Regions:
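A short, hydrophobic C-terminal helix/tail in secreted or cell-surface proteins
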Residues: 352-356
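Short, solvent-exposed loop/turn segments at secondary-structure junctions
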Residues: 15-17, 44-45, 89-91, 98-99, ...
Length: 356
């Protein structure tokens, strides 16, 4: 705080308590004597902005937080030209809850691999879901087999079912193996961090931060990605990054020196968006269903299958929100660039050059 000369913070939230940290951000800003500017984003605003946001994204990105970043950048751009953001802290200092998984699986993975595989096969043979099924499945695999970061969405069977022209058999390990090989001598948490730094951080976190801020001509700086910060982070033992009770342990201990305890110990929330709630609303269900039965959808998808994702989610049978969102973002992007979607006006400045 002594070296930070910023005097403003920016926050957005949504009309659900679980998805709204505006009051918390304001309280913290007051505590450290910084002005806070916030915006409560309505569901109508959020959904209306999607085509324009996908236009600015240039490529289909199925991360609902990109739209939240669009609105927080819009809010910030009204007051500043340059802003600092926290991208990179989770990847460097162990902030994602999934990094605690190796600790949770440790005892089970002491069993012989054949036994673990056998238990997982038995669990998978049971046609209905039950508590512990996913645990047995993941615990039967090595970290190299089970972890590709947040990018995993559809398995091979699902792809074959929903796509009209599915790609050939593809093993994600072909993509991640060269990176896992570079950290073969490291512990599982470090391996997961390395995968996220090379895939999730580059392909999602920084991509959406750059595109959404640039949509408002806002320059975003990411101090956690300074090479000196990385050189510190890489020396921190894993036990000081994650433990069974929390994440970013070392970073939280440092935060205690400068921030209130409630901040230093706050559980990670991320940038959550109430997509799974909205998809059960009749208005947004119908909006998605229209896209899922469109001409573009018919071109690439077996529409009965993707509508089933939507129906099952609405009826509460399973949480298909990420799968639905992934397909919908592709269709919105496709309509933007190959259909009759939003087209941003382009202004041209004509220069008259002196003749020599």
């Amino acid at each position: 705080r002594d070296r930070f000369n910023g005097d403003k913070t920016f926050t957005v939230g949504f009309d659900y308590e679980k998805y709204n940290e505006i009051d918390y951000a304001k309280a913290l800003s007051d505590k450290i004597k910084i002005d806070n500017y916030s915006k409560l984003v309505s569901s109508e605003e959020y959904w209306a902005a999607i085509p324009k946001i996908q236009y600015h994204m240039d490529e289909p990105l199925a991360d609902p937080a990109a739209i939240a970043l669009y609105f927080v950048s819009q809010t910030a751009a009204k007051h500043v030209k340059v802003a600092m953001s926290g991208e990179g802290a989770d990847e460097f200092f162990g902030g994602y809850n999934i990094y605690r998984e190796p600790l949770d699986l440790a005892e089970f993975q002491k069993l012989p691999k054949g036994l673990r595989k056998g238990l997982a096969n038995i669990a998978n043979a049971i046609p209905f879901k039950f508590k512990g099924k996913s645990f047995l499945n993941r615990a039967s695999k090595t970290v190299e087999e089970r972890f590709i970061g947040n990018a995993f969405m559809f398995n091979e069977k699902e792809r074959a079912r929903i796509l009209k022209n599915p790609t050939g058999k593809y093993d994600h390990k072909e993509l991640t193996k060269p990176f896992y090989d570079k950290v073969a001598d490291k512990d599982d948490v470090t391996k997961m961090q390395y995968i996220d730094i090379n895939f999730w951080l580059i392909g999602d976190i920084l991509l959406k931060a750059d595109k959404m801020s640039m949509a408002h001509s806002l320059e975003v700086r990411v101090p956690f990605l300074d090479k000196e910060v990385f050189n510190v982070a890489r020396t921190i033992p894993t036990k000081y990054k994650v433990n069974k009770s929390n994440t970013k342990y070392a970073m939280r201990q440092a935060a205690h020196r400068h921030l209130p305890d409630m901040v230093a110990e706050k559980k990670k929330l991320g940038f959550p968006v109430p997509i799974r709630i909205w998809l059960k609303d009749e208005k947004y269900y119908n909006m998605i269903k229209k896209a899922f039965t469109s001409e573009a959808a018919e071109k690439y998808f077996n529409t009965d299958e993707i509508v089933k994702y939507l129906d099952d989610h609405k009826e509460g049978k399973t949480d298909n929100s990420r799968k639905i969102w992934t397909i919908y973002m592709f269709l919105v992007w496709y309509e933007d660039f190959f259909g009759n979607g939003v087209k941003e006006p382009v202004s041209y400045t004509h220069l008259t050059l002196p003749t020599t």
